[in-house]
Amino acid sequence: MQQDEVIWQVVGHEFCSYRIKGEAQNFCRNEYNVTGLCNRQSCPLANSRYATVREDNGKLYLYMKTIERAHFPSKLWQRIKLSKNYAKALEQIDQQLLYWPGRQIHRCKQRLTRLTQYLLKARRLALKHQPALIPIKPKQAHREASRERKALIAAKLEKNIEKELVKRLKSGVYGDQPLNVNEEIWNKVLAAREGLIDEGEEEEEREEAELEFVSDDEDEEEISDLEDWLGSDQSMETSESEEEESSESESDEDEDEDNKGKIRKRKTDDAKKSRKKRAPHIHIEYEQERENEKIPAVQHSW
């Protein structure tokens, strides 16, 4: 048989796992406690006849415990669903707790009132649009804050520079007009640039107009080979004609050597110019006709 006084002596004075000690009063965190206070009348363990109101998924239920079901722990509490209408719920409590103490009925009604207010407030908050809360990492938040701070400093610096420039313009530090407003200065600069461009084009035209002389040694070699071949087939001429021809050939050879020396010098100079200027090359060939030199007829016998 259950003894309420014995249970309270153990639970109330010695030890209870549901008790929370406070400075002025102790509290109870048992889910079936109707007031939340730790005392003899409110303790659900030390009272064999007990009633309370609980909320489950937005619905209110009346829980009742009697001494007849104390030996069935699975059937210890009887649950009755209460109406959503507050007035009807109060009537249900009065009907179910008709022969119960008045203090117990009053406490159940108080708990019903508190839970009803709580549910109404929760429904109102659910209807309102609330911003979604996104967790932010502390490092990322610190990084973004530092970036914002640097951006503000840069913006203030730009504004200060702008203000300083406006003050200088108003005070006349740059004269009547700043440099980028006066058109005459820009016209002078453009004219100077155009003059430089024209001079560069004239220099390029001069480089292109310069001629380059190149000697043709192959023709001279062919002529000498022809003379040797003809000399082998010819008859011996008179000594006077040979002396005249030898003197003329020596003079011609001297002239050819002088021409070759000059041409080589020109080649070296022109090669240096061409490396520097990179102008196009123009080849000119000169043919020299010798009137005094007679080439005898060639007779072939095949």
Swiss-Prot record:
<feature type="short sequence motif" description="Nuclear localization signal">
    <location>
        <begin position="274"/>
        <end position="282"/>
    </location>
</feature>
<keyword id="KW-0963">Cytoplasm</keyword>
<dbReference type="GO" id="GO:0005634">
    <property type="term" value="C:nucleus"/>
</dbReference>
<dbReference type="InterPro" id="IPR006958">
    <property type="entry name" value="Mak16"/>
</dbReference>
<feature type="compositionally biased region" description="Acidic residues">
    <location>
        <begin position="198"/>
        <end position="230"/>
    </location>
</feature>
<dbReference type="Pfam" id="PF01778">
    <property type="entry name" value="Ribosomal_L28e"/>
</dbReference>
<protein>
    <recommendedName>
        <fullName>Protein mak16</fullName>
    </recommendedName>
</protein>
<dbReference type="GO" id="GO:0005829">
    <property type="term" value="C:cytosol"/>
</dbReference>
<dbReference type="GO" id="GO:1902626">
    <property type="term" value="P:assembly of large subunit precursor of preribosome"/>
</dbReference>
<dbReference type="GO" id="GO:0000460">
    <property type="term" value="P:maturation of 5.8S rRNA"/>
</dbReference>
<dbReference type="GO" id="GO:0005730">
    <property type="term" value="C:nucleolus"/>
</dbReference>
<keyword id="KW-0131">Cell cycle</keyword>
<comment type="similarity">
    <text>Belongs to the MAK16 family.</text>
</comment>
<feature type="short sequence motif" description="Nuclear localization signal">
    <location>
        <begin position="138"/>
        <end position="143"/>
    </location>
</feature>
<dbReference type="InterPro" id="IPR029004">
    <property type="entry name" value="Ribosomal_eL28/Mak16"/>
</dbReference>
<dbReference type="GO" id="GO:0000470">
    <property type="term" value="P:maturation of LSU-rRNA"/>
</dbReference>
<dbReference type="Pfam" id="PF04874">
    <property type="entry name" value="Mak16"/>
</dbReference>
<dbReference type="GO" id="GO:0030687">
    <property type="term" value="C:preribosome, large subunit precursor"/>
</dbReference>
<feature type="region of interest" description="Disordered">
    <location>
        <begin position="198"/>
        <end position="302"/>
    </location>
</feature>
<feature type="compositionally biased region" description="Acidic residues">
    <location>
        <begin position="239"/>
        <end position="258"/>
    </location>
</feature>
<keyword id="KW-0539">Nucleus</keyword>
<dbReference type="GO" id="GO:0030684">
    <property type="term" value="C:preribosome"/>
</dbReference>
<feature type="compositionally biased region" description="Basic and acidic residues">
    <location>
        <begin position="282"/>
        <end position="294"/>
    </location>
</feature>
